[in-house]
Amino acid sequence: MAEFVRNLAEKAPALVNAAVTYSKPRLATFWYYAKVELVPPTPAEIPTAIQSLKKIINSAKTGSFKQLTVKEALLNGLVATEVWMWFYVGEIIGKRGIIGYDV
């Protein structure tokens, strides 16, 4: 057991250095996209979002959504699933747990 700990202690700096070297460019890429994609909408973008929502509601009323191609329907489903999952991530963060609320 002592030999295992000694070997681990000897290899730890090299492992940490390799992990940092591997992670640094990926973390930079993540921060770039996080700053660009995760910003809240500006006041100028809100009317566009409302207009888009009105178009979706109108297509549901008139039945024009039946004219979508398979690719468009699949992409719309993926976007809806992404929004739904981000809602659940927010719920998990808010609850500070995966299951249930502390009552």
UniProtKB/Swiss-Prot annotation:
Keyword Translocase recorded: no
Modification N-acetylalanine occurs at: 2
InterPro entries on file: ATP_synth_F0_gsu_mt (IPR006808), ATP_synth_su_G_mt_met (IPR016702)
A Pfam family annotated for this UniProt entry: ATP-synt_G
Predominant localisation class: mitochondrion
Locations listed in the record: Mitochondrion; Mitochondrion inner membrane
Keyword Metal-binding belongs to the record: no
Assembly and interaction partners: Component of the ATP synthase complex composed at least of ATP5F1A/subunit alpha, ATP5F1B/subunit beta, ATP5MC1/subunit c (homooctomer), MT-ATP6/subunit a, MT-ATP8/subunit 8, ATP5ME/subunit e, ATP5MF/subunit f, ATP5MG/subunit g, ATP5MK/subunit k, ATP5MJ/subunit j, ATP5F1C/subunit gamma, ATP5F1D/subunit delta, ATP5F1E/subunit epsilon, ATP5PF/subunit F6, ATP5PB/subunit b, ATP5PD/subunit d, ATP5PO/subunit OSCP.
Designated name of the protein: ATP synthase F(0) complex subunit g, mitochondrial
Organism: Bos taurus (Bovine)
